[in-house]
Design a protein with these regions (language model features):
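Short, flexible, glycine/charge-rich loop motifs used to bind or transfer phosphoryl groups or to couple energy/partner
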Residues: 15, 38, 58-59
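Short alpha-helix capping/helix-loop boundary micro-motifs
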Residues: 32-37
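Short beta-strand-to-turn element immediately C-terminal to the catalytic PLP-Schiff-base lysine
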Residues: 27-28, 51
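C-terminal structural segments of small proteins and small subunits
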Residues: 49-80
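N-terminal first-folded block
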Residues: 1-26
Length: 80
């Protein structure tokens, strides 16, 4: 899992059927920017928890994704 900050969103006018209804966010992890499927209603500026890889795909009903926002972080003990 990774912690990051939502810095934008991605709008797709056409996408695969299995991605219909998914909202995508751009998340800065401090090392790279990732596009992640939003599962919790996060917004720009929110600190979020991401899951990546196969787990993200399984979390989203096996959609072809490799990152998903699974929590909005209120506090993380002062660590990035």
């Amino acid at each position: 899992m990774k912690i990051g900050k939502v810095i934008g969103s991605v709008w797709a006018t056409r996408k695969a059927q299995c991605l219909q209804g998914q909202r995508f966010l751009v998340v800065d992890t401090g090392r790279e920017d990732l596009v992640a499927a939003d599962q919790v209603g996060a917004g720009i500026g929110d600190k979020v928890l991401l899951t990546t890889g196969t787990v993200a795909s399984r979390y989203c009903m096996d959609a072809p994704i490799d990152a998903a926002v699974v929590a909005i972080v209120d506090e993380n003990g002062g660590h990035r």
